[in-house]
Amino acid sequence: MTLTDSEMEYIEGILGRKMNELEEGMLDVMFSEHCSYKSSRPILGTFPTEGENIILGPGDDAGLVSVTDKYALAVGMESHNHPSAIEPYGGAGTGIGGILRDIISMGARPIALLDSLRFGSLDDEKSKYLFEHVVEGISDYGNRVGVPTVAGEVEFDDSFRTNPLVNVMCVGLVEKDKIVRGKAPYVGDVFLLMGGTTGRDGIHGVTFASEELTSDSETEDRPAVQVADPFTKKRVLEASLEILDEINVSGVKDLGGGGLTCCISELVDESNNGARVDLRNIPLRETGMTPYEIMLSESQERMVFVINPKDVKKAQEICDKHEIVSAVIGEVIDGNNMIIDDEGSSLADLPTILLADPPSLNRELKEIAEDTSKVEVDHPPVRQSLLELLSSPNIASKQWVYKQYDHEVQVRTVVKPGDDAAVLRIDDDTAIALTTDANTIHTKLSPFDGGAGCVAEAIRNVISMGATPYAVVDCLNFGNPETPEILWQFKRTIEGMSLVAENFNAPVISGNVSFYNETEGIKINPTPAVGVIGVENIENIRTMDFKNSGDKILLIGTTYDEVTGSEYHRTIHNIEKGMAPRIRIEDELANGKTILKLLDEDSSKNITAVHDVSHGGLAVALSEMVMKGNIGCEIDLDSIITSEDLEESDLIYSESHGRYIITVNADAVDEILNKIDVPVAIIGEVKGAVLKLGDNEFTIDELNDSYHGVIEKYMA
């Protein structure tokens, strides 16, 4: 049990009595950090959550964004970190299953998955094992349920050796008049439990996720990891959507963390009603299960529909058709209590508000002094450093990962993995751009600028594809919130994220907090993994690859002396200190709006490529454009707009925010330049078969040999 003495006293003060074993187990689950957000809730409330395109912000299983007159997107992001550290294949698979159920719970059909993954160094055998089996778990689950995995990111850093991060984003499509919510508004409606049967797996999964891992966790906590079943999930998905299409459903919610306890209590509390649950009606996978085990089980692939009794027969016929189990397990009642019965005997009787709305905590915060010193290094020759940087697993091609994913099932994918963002078709005119991003070194060095930078980079990625950013989702991965310095990092990160989201009118509509990501004193780098959804006219889509010899290369934005905290410093110099790149929000906003305006007015397609500058700086961004297009370029480094005189390596590896590379048809350069009123310079031309950076030349083959096959060699 993880209930503290003060929480026990609070609970018993409200009840006016002692809890029995079942009640204590139910409340232990609901008071866990994972379910209650008791440490983070006061801080999360500072996020901007409303906007003109937002139908629903945080509070339900997913957020909702309007994309056309007819359609909305359901968008969510979840973590499955602790389970994946213990059982990587199953932990990753059940993470996919959970976010898919969240999207289905809004009435939407899942159309895309994205993943944001972090592991220790690939020189470490345990990290390789976790990486291999997490990717396998995501691949097997996503491919078998028929939902494409279209984008994502992977980082390798020693801070994640014992605490890998498995964050998954899902997007679903729903007609606006078919949206449902996680509510139980009508007394007399019944709870129809459908999907998989209830077993002993996952009991106390949420309390396990609300504690630090230890060296014994791999054996002691394995029973808390749920068992994935993608084949049942596919049937549950189709049956759920058919029920929603055929029946007037009052509400629906998936059974994830906290199992039936969490699902039922949140359904009725949202509608200020009560619930009665009859345990004897719940389909069980194992014999001899106790009420405690039944109510706390986190067995996968289960959903609860709130429906009128007259619709039960129709709903169960649909379940039978899809060969999944279903049963009426209770009803919505007057009052505000959740009552658990078994053969007429009341086993638990708890106020729903006590279960679904535990008190938040006002934990201590302690500021960490930021390192603002200038980090001086001896730069190796650019010929050496760029090829070495391209062969770093953090920069190198992630084809080993995404080739295992089916990214074209459902035939909506317009731009595939490997670009700034994935693009999916919604209808003949409308597409959406999707991306996930994080920069854990920046966030470690400066939580505010790191948090702001994560949102800004994700927004630049969708803008580079021609899409207007509509909304943000997140997974906020941190250490122990009981440590004042950790909670200060968390607060400052959210303040930075909020600054950018608010200025771009891209509210935070859904997300997840994962605390306690540390093992015996080893803490992860603070990791705000950010997903952004952008919407665009299909005609505005651009990609990063160089297209035509003779095109002029323009760099929009100013380059600052901001190489500290960069991939260059981490990879080439093994340094992770100094000042992180700062967010200059006015410039970030102006430059982003400039790109969108240029693309919107470019009916002749004179702008042929767009790419943002981020990890690895200008040198890596240009290398990617060369390799993608299989055509070289010549860059005049002296033409780049800078804040001051910079050494060559500081210039090409700076990770200053707010910068975009665009290529323009030579005949249209003057026309395009006349439309730009932010810092811009012609820095080169697309030509030949080499990348020429000042006096440094690289053949396309050299770049490809460094960039491709890196992860494959580690995993061979």
From Swiss-Prot:
Pathway: Purine metabolism; IMP biosynthesis via de novo pathway; 5-amino-1-(5-phospho-D-ribosyl)imidazole from N(2)-formyl-N(1)-(5-phospho-D-ribosyl)glycinamide: step 1/2. GO terms for molecular function: ATP binding; magnesium ion binding; phosphoribosylformylglycinamidine synthase activity. Mg(2+) 2 binds at residues 102, 254. It is found in: Cytoplasm. Pfam families: AIRS (PF00586), AIRS_C (PF02769), FGAR-AT_linker (PF18072). Monomer. Part of the FGAM synthase complex composed of 1 PurL, 1 PurQ and 2 PurS subunits. The gene is purL. ATP binds at residues 37, 474, 511. InterPro entries: PRibForGlyAmidine_synth_PurL, PurL_linker, PurM-like_C_dom, PurM-like_C_sf, PurM-like_N, PurM-like_N_sf. SUPFAM superfamilies: PurM C-terminal domain-like, PurM N-terminal domain-like. Its EC number is 6.3.5.3. Mg(2+) 1 binds at residues 78, 512. GO terms for cellular component: cytoplasm. Keywords: ATP-binding, Cytoplasm, Ligase, Magnesium, Metal-binding, Nucleotide-binding, Purine biosynthesis. CDD domains: PurL_repeat1, PurL_repeat2. One of its GO terms (biological process) is 'de novo' IMP biosynthetic process. The lineage of its organism: Archaea, Methanobacteriati, Methanobacteriota, Methanomada group, Methanobacteria. It comes from Methanobrevibacter smithii (strain ATCC 35061 / DSM 861 / OCM 144 / PS). Belongs to the FGAMS family. Substrate binds at residues 79-82, 101, 226, 298-300, 514. Signal peptide: none annotated. It catalyses: N(2)-formyl-N(1)-(5-phospho-beta-D-ribosyl)glycinamide + L-glutamine + ATP + H2O = 2-formamido-N(1)-(5-O-phospho-beta-D-ribosyl)acetamidine + L-glutamate + ADP + phosphate + H(+). The keyword ATP-binding applies. This is Phosphoribosylformylglycinamidine synthase subunit PurL.
